[in-house]
Amino acid sequence: MSHGPLRVGIGGPVGAGKTTLTEKLCAALAHRCSMAVITNDIYTREDAEALMRAQVLPAERIRGVETGGCPHTAIREDASINLAAVADLRRTFPDLDLILIESGGDNLAATFSPELADLTIYVIDTAAGQDIPRKRGPGLARSDLLVVNKIDLAPHVGVDLARLEADTQAARGQRPYVMARMRAGVGVEAIVAFLEREGGLQLLPQD
């Protein structure tokens, strides 16, 4: 691509499964394209360290950014710290095809600057409650792809999954969504297909 690697922003509340999604995408794609990850944490680099421990990418392809008290600012109003990390990765790996940018945990209003992310994926947690899709924050309603994660927990937390999906459809309109269980890898293929289709990501054939 003429403007460099596809940059995909991954957002969502704390505990929704952003780091698990990032880990699963790395496991699925690292052998099929040149990729890297930037994680945003408020005061630590815990998410970056978790990915390094999982060994889904070489450590030098993972950057941890400490955002301070307002993680949404670092992905929208002042994305300079993340843009600097993107530039550093591109200098180090000129052949990059894909950069995943994981936001710090935030609320339903968090969105990525178009300057930072070409596509946005927003992750919500089924266990957070039946009414989450009806709240329709910008991340949920306007992200390029919504991932409804942990659907296996629905019966344990009193969530009607069929109603949750109907409310998700109503909130999303024509925009795509995936019902997922990231920890088990359910939904990963659909997300990869989305990146190919909407992001023009070109992948090597699977082994």
Curated annotation (Swiss-Prot):
Annotated localization: Cytoplasm
Annotated GO biological process: urea catabolic process
Alphabetical UniProt keywords: Chaperone, Cytoplasm, GTP-binding, Nickel insertion, Nucleotide-binding
Coiled coil regions in record: none
Binding site for GTP: 12-19
GO cellular component terms given for this protein: cytoplasm
Pfam entry (one): cobW
GO MF annotations, alphabetized: GTP binding; GTPase activity; nickel cation binding
Gene3D superfamilies: P-loop containing nucleotide triphosphate hydrolases
Major location category of this protein: cytoplasm
Presence of the UniProt keyword Kinase in the record: no
Superkingdom of the organism of origin: Bacteria
Cited SUPFAM superfamilies: P-loop containing nucleoside triphosphate hydrolases (SSF52540)
Family according to the record: Belongs to the SIMIBI class G3E GTPase family. UreG subfamily.
Binding partners and assembly: Homodimer. UreD, UreF and UreG form a complex that acts as a GTP-hydrolysis-dependent molecular chaperone, activating the urease apoprotein by helping to assemble the nickel containing metallocenter of UreC. The UreE protein probably delivers the nickel.
Job of this protein: Facilitates the functional incorporation of the urease nickel metallocenter. This process requires GTP hydrolysis, probably effectuated by UreG.
Protein name per UniProt: Urease accessory protein UreG
